[in-house]
Regions:
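Acidic/proline-rich low-complexity IDRs
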Residues: 3, 50, 57, 121, ...
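S-adenosyl-L-methionine-dependent methyltransferase catalytic module, highlighting the catalytic core
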Residues: 69-80, 84, 88-200
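Basic, mixed-charge low-complexity alpha-helical segments
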Residues: 53, 199-202
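Alpha-helical structural elements
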Residues: 19, 51, 111-114, 119, ...
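Long, low-complexity, intrinsically disordered segments
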Residues: 201-211
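Conserved SAM-binding loop
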Residues: 2-104, 124-131, 173-180
Length: 211
């Protein structure tokens, strides 16, 4: 089993490393910050194209997309490209009140904090226009409800507060497959007949005389 794990969390990393020692691929921009695990250095901005196509059974990441100074379309294109046909992509992101906002240019820590809520964030993932950012890239289940999967007793045992058990928020977990990617397939441009050069020349001369 092949697993690609961006910015691996200790609990999950320990589990996956035991589950598939040879197939677990934890990656991060700053791997030296991990003391509990050997992590491969990986820059999402420059390295996404290096991921082998159709390689991973599972790709997961939690709260990283708000940090990425690159197009979300670029990131998710390569995530789904690297996924196997029957693979699964699991992720969470800080879904917030309001509308989507993004700025990939230089910004001071103070301005970034004021605009996005945190100095190292480059986008605000608003729930009001969810279908126009994350929802435009892939089919996502907006009726998130952990109570349909786990009992209240299990949720309490995992210390998941009631406010985070359903709906769109920072704790919402999305699970997608290749079929959920909305931009899949080869895009074919609509056929547009080539313009008649003589007719176009006459139109231009007529316009220039008028001008």
């Amino acid at each position: 089993m092949k697993i690609l794990h961006f910015a691996p969390e200790k609990g999950l990393a320990t589990l996956f490393a035991e589950l598939t020692p040879e197939g677990y691929d934890p990656v991060d921009l700053a791997p030296d910050g991990y003391r509990f695990l050997k992590v491969r250095q990986f820059d999402v901005v420059t390295d996404m194209e290096t991921l082998a196509t159709g390689t991973y059974d599972l790709i997961l990441h939690s709260h990283i997309v708000e940090h990425l100074p690159i197009s979300l379309a670029h990131f998710f294109f390569h995530v789904f490209r690297a996924l196997k046909e029957d693979g699964v992509h699991v992720f969470a992101a800080p879904l917030m009140p309001g509308h989507y906002d993004e700025y990939l240019g230089p910004l001071s820590k103070e301005d970034a904090t004021k605009r996005f809520g945190q100095w190292d964030h480059v986008r605000w993932l608003g729930v009001e226009d969810f279908d126009r950012h994350l929802g435009a890239l892939m089919r996502l289940e907006k009726d998130f409800d952990l109570t349909k999967i786990f009992s209240k007793r299990e949720l309490r045992a995992c210390n998941i507060p009631a406010s985070q058990q359903m709906g769109l928020h920072g704790s919402t977990v999305f699970m997608t497959t290749k079929n959920d990617y909305r931009l899949a397939g080869d895009y074919e441009m609509p056929h547009t007949p080539s313009p008649d050069p003589i007719r176009e020349s006459r139109k231009r001369r007529k316009f220039l005389r008028w001008w």
